[in-house]
Each structure stands twice: as C-alpha cells, then as structure tokens.
A protein has these predicted regions:
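N-terminal targeting signals for export/organelle localization
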Residues: 1-10
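Local sequence-structure signature of Cys/Sec-based thiol-disulfide redox active-site neighborhoods
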Residues: 13-50
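Thiol-based oxidoreductase modules, predominantly thioredoxin-like and allied folds used
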Residues: 26, 45, 50-70, 97
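Conserved beta-strand elements of beta-rich interaction domains across eukaryotes
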Residues: 28-30, 67, 90
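Extracytoplasmic/secreted proteins, especially bacterial periplasmic and envelope-associated proteins
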Residues: 36, 40-43, 70, 98, ...
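A short glycine-leucine-enriched loop at secondary-structure breakpoints
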Residues: 73-78
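Non-catalytic, surface beta->alpha helical segment in thiol-disulfide oxidoreductase systems
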Residues: 79-111
Length: 111
C-alpha cells in the first residue's frame, strides 16, 4: 500500500528502457475530498503499477501540495484533489471523479 505523499524529489524513471509518463495526484492531508479519493487512487496504483498503457509505463506520484508547493505551482494546481498526466509533451488534466475505471479510461484515451 502507498503511504502518504511523495515529494517532487522522489520522482524518478525506474524503467529507463521504456517510454515513461507521470500521473500526479495533487492533494493535501486536511482536504475531505482528498481523503475520500486517496483509497481509490491507491487501489488503482496497486492494480496498475507494473502495467503499460498503449506501450507507455506510468509513474504514479502523490504530491502533498502543502509540502511541495513548487510542484503544485508548476502544474497550476488550484483545487484538491487534482490529477494531471505529464506526457513530456503535454500536461492533461483528469476531470472526472477519481475512480479506477475512469482513471483507466483516461490513460487509455490520453496515451
């Protein structure tokens, strides 16, 4: 199970021979919507951390915006939770309720 949030410094490519994208979950500990969404996110990550989507490996990163405001600012996060996909060429915001099926569809459609 994923514990807590990562900092921007925890982001790395653990799969150097694959094309890698990053899916960020931006939240804060005090947000009730983040607390509600976090278990669904963690379950989705657990189910998909070793899979590829359309040939691309996805790094899943939780960001605590209170502790890593620079990363939140970089991705223009203004509300919580916010989920964004960074493909290297584009940043795409996920605009649905963070549920496993919707996240899977988002990655399949975006990559």
């Amino acid at each position: 199970m994923i514990e807590g949030y990562a900092s921007g410094m925890d982001i790395r490519n653990n799969h150097p021979n694959e094309e890698v994208v990053t899916l960020y979950f931006f939240g804060v500990e005090w947000c009730p919507h983040c607390k509600h969404a976090k278990p669904e996110w963690e379950s989705f990550v657990k189910d998909n951390e070793n899979k590829t989507f359309n040939g691309k490996k996805v790094n899943f990163v939780m960001v605590d915006c209170d502790k890593d405001s620079a990363l939140a600012d970089k991705y223009d996060v203004s509300g919580y939770p916010t989920i964004k996909l960074d493909t290297g060429a584009d940043v795409i915001e996920f605009k649905s309720k963070p549920e496993k099926d919707a996240l899977t569809q988002f990655l399949n459609n975006s990559l």
